[in-house]
Amino acid sequence: MAPPFTDDPESQRPSTSRLSQDSLSSVSTTSLVFDRIQEEMDRDPSASRSARRDLLPATKDEGDFDENASETGAFLGPPGVPLQRQPMDRGFRRILIIIGAVFVGAWLAGLGIFVLSGSYKHESDSEHDPDANSRGSGKAVTMDQVFGGFWSARSHSISWIADPDGGDGLLLEVNTANGYLVVEDVRADKESTDTNAGQTADTQPAKPRVLMRDPYFMYHGEIKRPDWNEPSPDLKKVLLAVKREKNWRHSFQATYFILDVETAQVQPLVPDNVNAKVQLANWSPTSDAISFTMDNNIYIRRLNQANDVVQITKDGGPEYFYGIPDWVYEEEVFAGRSATWWSDDGKYLAFLRTNETAVPEYAIEYYIQRPSGKKPAVGEEAYPEIRKIKYPKPGAHNPVVDVQYYDVSKGDVFSISAPDEFPDHDRIISNVLWAGNKVLLKQSNRIGDFLKVILVDPSQREAKIVNSINIAEIDGGWFEISHTMTYIPADPSKGRQQDGYVDTVIHEGYEHIGYFTPIDNPKPIMLTSGSWEVEDAPSAVDLNNNLVYFVATKESSIQRHVYSVKLDGTNLTPLTNTSSEGYYTVSFSSRSGFALLSYKGPKIPYQKVISTPSIPIQFSRTIEDNADLADKAKKHELPILKYGTLQLPNGISVNYLERRPPHFNPKKKYPILFQQYSGPKSQTVTKKFAVDFQSYVASSLGYLVVTIDPRGTGFLGRQHRVVVRSQLGVLEAQDHIAAAKHYSSLPYVDPSRLAIWGWSYGGFQTLKTLEVDAGDTFSYGMAVAPVTDWRFYDSIYTERYMRLPQDNTAGYDASAVRNATALGMNKRFLIMHGSADDNVHFQNSLKLLDYLDLAGIENYDVHVFPDSDHSIAFHGANRMVYDRLNNWLVNAFNGEWLKIADPKPIDTKKRRHVS
């Protein structure tokens, strides 16, 4: 189950300030000193009492004179008494001089420390410090800021593109000063300060190539504006998509055109149907053909002959898909819209065939919009539009998939099966990778705990299983789907005697990188090892230098750094500064000589392009510093962040993030909002910078916001996550409750005001935690788009963690949210759902509401968003979700929901009537 948004849930980062003062000129040194005295008093109660005695004026009796009055002083007598001058004793004078000198010296020393420490600065002049223990004066974070993009860090994605001439460092830029589509060298002068050492005439930046001058083109007198583009590998043509229409999370259909770069002429991809709705189009590696899927059939457009279109399949339609995934494979397997793979030489095309004949349909009703674009028949305007999706649920028929091959020269389509591969009803194909003139396939059983790697030879039409991994026997868990398996061709001159591949493998309880060579060797050379994990590895492979680049948690489970390692497992080297905390992502150029390094936190995010150890030159250019975001962080009161590891009963350790209000006072009693996602292998507690809804709650509402990553979540080793198998939500609920009990015991927490919330899996976990807790610890909960019974979610995701319901009835029952009586023991909870959610069906919430009705439980609120899908965004609904969360939470912590638990009419006899 993917989260509702592309950016995984992010953690928070702080800033500075107290009042809305922006410069030192508006703040006196005296006020700053008193601010710091107050902070010290808050931290040390004993010092606080003595400091207050020193700061408060003494109580004066009537008739006492004021020693501090301007008219009199400490050495002056009472009013009316004449002054008498007397000579001062010489010894006493010497003592006074010494005391004065000591005082002046101490004052000067203190002033020096004050200046050198920067304490004289107003908080809004200080750099953002994510580890600060207190906040000064500044502006509060607002909801409008959070949802208006005010706190969004600017970031740039680089579309790296292979150089047909064999170079490196080329990227595709859109809407530049030179043209709409321009191929640039990443080293091209951008009027910035660079480190650009070691360049020679052979390593000078390539000149820009303009592929498309204007952001539109003309076809038969009509202006067309592209929504999507893909240059051919030889950069001589560009595939353009117009009138793009969204389908599911990743997929869309559009009308496609082919632009000739040299002549600027365009032609339709489908010559005899200019307005054809094409679902997918891909260039061949040789630039002389384009494969595309239309009406679920796959075609090839050959460009060396005019109007030459070859239809490869003919039975595509509602039941059969070719070259594109169906709903469940798009969502849960490929995480994308393509299921087509060209061989490197362009001689073969591999594609997925999906047979959905036996897959049950799920109907989604649209009450407001008509996604089909079709007008209803006359007299049927008042009926909702119904869209039926082939949606397999646990235990139901899955789509039957296999890989087919098209021989371009012979024009025939064929399939190749390996002995002992999984049968049709029990097969998931998760990876297809061309390895030279062969293909590597990954197949698993439908519950995802047995993996087979198959090597296919299309030219010989043979296949064999080269590796079988019984994950159930290794740790009782499941196979994690990834798409980073990388082919390593043989090159004896580089020490690689035979073909192989690099992939993520389970090694001693953690996910690491293994190098399999020869390609049919089931025993890898381990490139990494230890009590840490790699993420989506490898990120890139430099074949010239036998280097593998990857991102890992080697420094900390909540950080990410970038490393390289040799193919023999030696010389593991960081590319990022591991002496400082950091959360990095990275993308590499086609030959791995350059990398876009994106620093996500904990400080202000930035991006820079760097050279890698793969090339002899040194290059570094910052392309985004988010200086404006840094300035905003200085001037606003962001939460105080506390990271750590929480020790729960039975030796369980979980990462936590506690967000405190900017002016946190340990002597106060704070309510807590627990925010979580909790899904398998997810991670919410990270060192990323973020100012989001949780930041707003802590900064502006003044509540504590706590997140933990319970058992089942990622990057703490396999044993931390696979224990949840067959009983999703149960152990996670225990961890959330244990964490809440720990916080309830702290002196600064109000144990009567604890709430929990989440979206999607987080919505499920919210309700499951409230059910297990039954009001003992948590009082309130807010669940958005929740699963309530895993029998209602899709089969591929659910069965991976829960197995088949026919084999695990007790586990499905234990995971389902169905104990309405237990939910009724909480003070109140909120459920929100979109009626057109194609991912977590509205059926989930309706089933729970029926349980509540049957039990007579009424301590909840429901908000349904018409025609919204899983993101709940139709007709401005997304902001309404958070407004409702905000208002509902404030009412909860203010005790308003307690007033309506047993409402009574107002006694009309006691009302005052005004005539």
Curated annotation (Swiss-Prot):
Vacuolar side: 116-915
Active-site feature positions: 760 (charge relay system), 837 (charge relay system), 870 (charge relay system)
Region (Disordered) residue spans: 1-82
Protein's UniProt name: Probable dipeptidyl-aminopeptidase B
Compositionally biased region (Low complexity): 15-32
Gene3D superfamilies membership: alpha/beta hydrolase, Dipeptidylpeptidase IV, N-terminal domain
Residues carrying sugar: 355, 577, 819
GO cellular component, one term: vacuolar membrane
Main enzyme class: hydrolase
Keywords for the protein's UniProt record, in alphabetical order: Aminopeptidase, Glycoprotein, Hydrolase, Membrane, Protease, Serine protease, Signal-anchor, Transmembrane, Transmembrane helix, Vacuole
Predominant location: membrane
Pfam family for this entry, one: Peptidase_S9
Record gene name: DAPB
Molecular function terms, GO-annotated: aminopeptidase activity; dipeptidyl-peptidase activity; serine-type peptidase activity
Biological role stated in the UniProt entry: Type IV dipeptidyl-peptidase which removes N-terminal dipeptides sequentially from polypeptides having unsubstituted N-termini provided that the penultimate residue is proline.
Protein EC: 3.4.14.5
Family classification: Belongs to the peptidase S9B family.
Compartment annotation: Vacuole membrane
Ranges of the Cytoplasmic topological domain: 1-94
GO biological process: proteolysis
Chain segments annotated as transmembrane: 95-115
Membrane-protein topology: Single-pass type II membrane protein
